[in-house]
Amino acid sequence: ALKAEVYMWTARAYSTSAVVADLDVAIASIDAIPGASGGSVSFVTSDWKSIFKRQANDCPEYIWANYFDYLVGPKNNLHDAITLRIDNVPIEMQGTFPIAVTDEGLNRIEIGSNMNTIFRKYETIEAHDNPFDKTDDAGPFYDKRDLRYINSMVDTNGDGSTNVCIKFPGILVTTDNRRYWDNDLPIYRWTGMLLLKAEALLAKGQTSAVVDILNMTRTRAGLANYSGATDFNTLENELLDEVAREMLAENQRWWGLIRAHKVGQNVPRFMANRGDDSTDANIWNFYYWPIAESVKIKNDKLVQSPGY
């Protein structure tokens, strides 16, 4: 997995023209993962939320993860940021997705006027009694119900269509009257590797194979197969968006934006905050990385990158 990521970086990040030999190494490295794991790594085809077990060894999708347990470390690994407070959730919905037992300073997770447009395009159009019941009154927009972001019937925007992510639920400890967010933190997950492979295949012009991988993740999310254009730019943007939806809170999208040279399109303030013109294509050969304070302390000759 690490080798594949390294070669995808050398294949795409340093030039707008992909290095085919490096793409081939990345693809071969990804294809070798199931065998190298003794067959223990596989794509989960049903119940998306079941992928995210507290312990990585219980999930066939996890390739490499950092151990986490509230009993021996911090009580919260920040996944509470994608969890609803209980005071936002109707009683009839409280067993549907992970919630906090008490108001611990958590914010609503909304898909509406304040939410990233990547998620908003898959928001549930109508309010539903049961987001898991395909026979309810979903109407003509049912195929836009992304099961990764379940309708919660919390009508905060007046449109009846607020959603919540259902991954990394941690554990509800009733004796403590609270939820601990202590899922093991995935570094590499098999679906992420498949999407990385799709990126490599797209760079080689193999668009049908890219669509096949997109449809794997879309089908599991309850979405219709991809039916959009298959020119390079359109498909690349769709792939970047799918990584954002599927790999939320798994630290993958940023690196994909850099490899695609599309940070400016998606995070324009990244360059604007550094005094550069985000509309100038020439600046995208340069990316500024922060230098950790601990590193600067050890080497006082280092100068912090602009903007940090």
Predicted regions and their residues:
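Sparse recognition of residues in long alpha-helices and their boundaries
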Residues: 20, 48-49, 207, 255
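Elongated scaffold/linker segments in the mid-to-C-terminal portions of large proteins
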Residues: 39-203, 263-308
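Short, solvent-exposed loop/turn segments at the edges of secondary structure
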Residues: 1, 57-59, 252
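Acidic/polar loop patches that form or flank catalytic/metal-binding clefts of enzymes
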Residues: 36-47, 225-228, 250
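Extended, hydrophobic/aromatic-rich amphipathic alpha-helical segments that build helical scaffolds
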Residues: 1-15, 19-34, 64, 146, ...
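C-terminal structured "cap/appendage" subdomains that terminate the fold
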Residues: 213-272
